Amino acid sequence: FTQPCLTAMEWPEKRLTVYGAAFSGPEQPEGFLTGFTAPADGNIHIGLLHGEVDPAEARYNPIRREEIAASSLDYLALGHIHKRTEPLTCGKTICAWPGCPEGRGFDELGEKGFYSGTVGDDGRISLTFIPFARRRYEILTVDVTGREPRAAVEAALPAETALDLYRILLTG
């Protein structure tokens, strides 16, 4: 999407309409979803938006839960938050942030991946999280009181850590 307004792309043969919008600057204080309602035309309606739900400060496409419910979208795929959320249902709309597919630093900890969505025969969307990252960023606190530090760290590390990156905090 290239325009700073909600734009539709249609695939009639799949009964699918996808809506999205692009930021025209570093911030987007007005919400793209405000006043939008998908038509009741029997199609699957999916939104792709970079934004924040119920933000305290409106800087990056603020989206209110009431707007999500009023949108009548079947699924709203959200970006901006790099930490995965569990799917949230607002009205009939399911939405979620998958996070990012690969962590880039110690401010993006844990398992990373994406959501795979399925449209059922009844039109309902189901989401499954698919781990994707080759490595994880983790912070590990190790108490070394009365222990040899290296042995304590090695004992605290999970078995599968060869590709993972750890910030290790020693206490004690």
Protein language model features and the residues they cover:
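Binuclear metal-dependent phosphoesterase catalytic core
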Residues: 5-14, 96-162, 167-169
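His/Asp/Glu-rich metal-coordinating catalytic cores
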Residues: 1-118
